């Protein structure tokens, strides 16, 4: 299957930014700005082509394991967000995660060491000579955006950023990267970091070349995305990958070709990516949602649609993913699609999402039996919400 992988990773970076904004208060578009600054610096150092693409990918995903770390190690006690040597744990997790992704070049240790300081005072005690260049570039870009991104990109901030780099050269950041940043960013260029056009500039520098992926690679990519979505809340900690696996199984059971199976697997993994834009106070509310809270929750499917819309030639998979709460009678959300507007895969995803949600165990409930879940699906089909033919296929496919 041919995919715009960098576009997918960009969408993933938006999801990460949403989660980080809630948990550790990074500024909007943090990952993309880190990627843009990194690419501009790398150009000054003679890096180009596939290496530049891989640097952009690493920069977009530099904090891919932060939410995983908070969930697993800190049990979501955000007051204890990692400092100093503790930062190394999320770097280790992030390094392991990106090994699943299809890079063009060797990016070993780039994520692992992206919080190392030039003088060896970082979490792993590595000096700048021992750290991959990509790690050092991302480290500088990340530091600047975390320190100044939320304050806006003005002449005053530019002067403060330059002052910070000069003051910390040789201790926190290395001279090679400081020089590259100062060569890449004059004041007018720095000011564009606060404008929407910097994203356009990023993709002009890094053409999004499509890659041919084997199904095993697609499964790894999908698992990576699903993990980011599912670590948003322990209430749905395995839901996305469960939907992906069910989508694969049902698609094969119904006789679809392997490309359709691959697309359905990816759509299943991504179907709830929009939930990253919904606060955990709603996702994890133990009681019934208020009308206003449910209205916010319903937006997650629309967020999925819009997040995935930025990926080239992804409309089909986007729709299969985003329409999982639509109903045949037009009473679903977010777009109120009717039967005439919903194709077979979109109808399948609606059934699969409900079936998986009913049968999986969560902290507040035990999963239902196959028989009980199918009773509910048939009730929804009889109301005109779900496709009866597909409900029957679900019943037969997942029995036993």
Predicted features along the sequence, with ranges:
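Histidine- and acidic-residue-rich, metal-dependent catalytic cores
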Residues: 3-400
């Amino acid at each position: 299957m041919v995919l715009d992988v960098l576009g997918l990773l960009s969408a993933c970076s938006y999801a990460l930014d949403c989660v980080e904004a809630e948990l550790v208060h990074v500024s909007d578009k943090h990952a993309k700005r880190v990627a843009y600054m990194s690419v501009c610096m790398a150009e000054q150092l003679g890096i180009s082509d596939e290496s530049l693409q891989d640097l952009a990918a690493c920069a977009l995903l530099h904090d891919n394991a932060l939410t995983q770390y908070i969930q697993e190690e800190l049990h979501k006690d955000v007051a204890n967000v990692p400092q100093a040597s503790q930062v190394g744990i999320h770097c280790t997790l992030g390094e392991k995660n990106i090994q699943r992704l299809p890079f063009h070049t060797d990016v070993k240790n780039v994520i692992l060491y992206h919080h190392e300081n030039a003088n060896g005072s970082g979490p792993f005690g590595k000096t700048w000579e021992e750290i991959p260049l990509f790690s050092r570039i991302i480290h500088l870009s990340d530091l600047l955006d975390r320190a100044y991104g939320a304050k806006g990109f003005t002449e005053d901030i530019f002067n403060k950023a330059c002052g910070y780099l000069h003051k910390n050269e040789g201790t926190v950041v290395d001279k090679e990267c400081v020089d590259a940043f100062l060569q890449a960013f004059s004041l007018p260029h720095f000011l564009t970091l606060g404008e929407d056009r910097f994203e356009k500039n990023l993709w002009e520098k890094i053409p999004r070349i499509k890659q041919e992926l084997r199904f095993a690679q697609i499964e790894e990519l999908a698992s990576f995305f699903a993990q980011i979505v599912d670590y948003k809340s322990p209430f749905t900690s395995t839901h996305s990958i469960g939907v992906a696996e069910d989508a694969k199984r049902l698609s094969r059971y119904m006789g679809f070709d392997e490309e359709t199976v691959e697309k359905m697997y990816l759509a299943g993994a991504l179907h709830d990516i929009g939930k990253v834009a919904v606060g955990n106070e709603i996702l994890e509310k133990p009681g019934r949602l208020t009308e206003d809270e449910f209205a916010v929750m319903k937006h997650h499917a629309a967020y999925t649609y819009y997040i995935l819309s930025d990926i080239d030639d992804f409309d089909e998979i986007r729709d299969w993913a985003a329409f999982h709460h639509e109903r045949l009678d037009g009473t679903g959300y977010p777009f109120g699609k009717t039967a005439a507007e919903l194709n077979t895969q979109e109808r399948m995803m609606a059934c699969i999402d409900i079936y998986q949600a009913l049968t999986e165990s969560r902290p507040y409930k035990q999963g239902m039996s196959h028989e009980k879940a199918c009773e509910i699906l048939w009730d929804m089909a009889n109301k005109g919400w779900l496709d009866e033919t597909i409900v029957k296929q679900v019943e037969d496919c997942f029995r036993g």
